[in-house]
Amino acid sequence: MDSAVTAVLAGKYPAKQHARRVAEALKASGHDGSGVIYLEGTKTRMAEDSDEAVPFRQRRNFYYLSGCELADSYVTYNIDQDELVLYIPAADPDEVMWTGLPLSPEEALKKYDVDKVLASSEINAHLAHYCTNKETAPKRVYAIPDRVCAETTFLPFDDTNWDALSNALNQCRKVKDDYEIALLKRSNEISALAHLAVMKAAKLAKNERELEAVFRSTCLSHGSRGQSYGPIVAAGVNGATLHYQTNDMDLEDLVTGERPSLLVDAGGEYRLYCSDITRAYPLSGKFSVEARQIYDIVLDMQTQCMDMIKPGVAWDDIHARAHKVAISGLLRLGILRGSEEELFEKRISVAFFPHGLGHYMGMDTHDVGGNPNHADPNPMFRYLRLRGTLSPSEVVTVEPGVYFCRFIIEPYLSSPELGKYIDSAVLDKYWKVGGVRIEDNLVITQDGYLNLTTVPKDPEEVERIVQQG
């Protein structure tokens, strides 16, 4: 692990700095810069007909202003007084025998970057306390709709603003500080070890689920206690399903003994910060001719797109470049027919590359602030999760792919207008490839990018790793 990352993460999560940034964003959006910001953490929720709690996932906006992973907690930031207060559950004698003593206010104050720690039960009293002096009392509280429990009251305040806080948080969370980038680096470091472990286990594995287990266990053993999303471990034609989750197919044909290629899209989560990495490689240790041809196209798509990345460049333009490279490659193979210009104009490549090139990444895999437009009439951009220009300290994924999904492609083949652009006889050789996607995580810098992802992707190197096991 990178010692420089470890040194950064030895400090406190910069919650106070984040609170100040959000306050500045509120002011920049036309508000007077006064008031109290209010956020709740995730509540403990019990599974139906059970005394077990459902798996806990902390609210990301709450964590951004607290650094706290405890359930049933609150945070307030008094903008005028520059005071950040965390409210955590007090000890419940009935629970201590089962779960041990909870974090005390004194321990929490040492652990978190806040000015004061109170009990969760004191939230209403402290909100009222803000308003005891009418001359200096904040007039407004900023909160998020449907993120305030019934027990909380804002009656002491003259006004509750339900519109501004979510947008301010989204704008701030887009731009990562050094501490957040260190968390994302560590998440990538752990996930790189896990991807490499899967590559080494691939040749002898019998079922997709075995390789999912390798990924999860490697992450856990290195401090990543959760996954950014459900791992995608897709062999052969399963790789044509973008978010395949079954992960339960045998990896060897019982009749021929053939082993297909594998697509693994998986990322561990470290202290709520994500990684999102995809690699594809042959389970036998040697790409088939068709799989290698598609792999080379996708790697070229990613390389050319990454060459364009720097501040001020429109993500739409980078995404369009990926489609143009895909068209050129599929034309060379004879899968497509016609001119590059006409194929791009007709959006034929969408049949093989239906999703967006990438997205913001942070505490959420598909992080906030991307401004997608799923109503876009242009099918090439409809599923693009990031619309706009790049800025320094944003973190994006770059994940081009080429897929052979019958459900998507066959309507093109049967279309009188579009079918002529695809040679079905040539296409028939590629269905078994399933899909190839290559995905890295990049930090936008002042003059380009920093690639956080170190998992090998050179095809010869990948083959060698799988062969050696």
Swiss-Prot record:
Transmembrane domains' residue ranges: none
Cofactor binding: number and manner: Binds 2 manganese ions per subunit.
Enzyme Commission number(s) from the entry: 3.4.11.9
Catalysed reaction, written as an equation: Release of any N-terminal amino acid, including proline, that is linked to proline, even from a dipeptide or tripeptide
Pfam families to which the protein is assigned, alphabetical: AMP_N, Peptidase_M24
Record carries keyword Plastid: no
Record keyword NADP present: no
Annotated signal peptide: none
SUPFAM superfamilies in the cross-refs: Creatinase/aminopeptidase, Creatinase/prolidase N-terminal domain
Keywords (A to Z) from UniProt: Aminopeptidase, Hydrolase, Manganese, Metal-binding, Metalloprotease, Protease
A molecular-function term among this protein's GO annotations: metalloaminopeptidase activity
Gene Ontology biological process terms, A to Z: proteolysis
Binding residue positions for Mn(2+) 1: D276, E399, E439
Cofactor(s) needed: Mn(2+)
InterPro entries, alphabetized: Aminopep_P_N, Creatin/AminoP/Spt16_N, Creatinase/aminopeptidase-like, Pept_M24, X-Pro_dipept-like
UniProt binding sites for Mn(2+) 2: D265, D276, E439
Record function comment: Catalyzes the removal of a penultimate prolyl residue from the N-termini of peptides.
Similarity annotation: Belongs to the peptidase M24B family.
Protein name: Probable Xaa-Pro aminopeptidase PEPP
Organism, as annotated: Coccidioides posadasii (strain RMSCC 757 / Silveira) (Valley fever fungus)
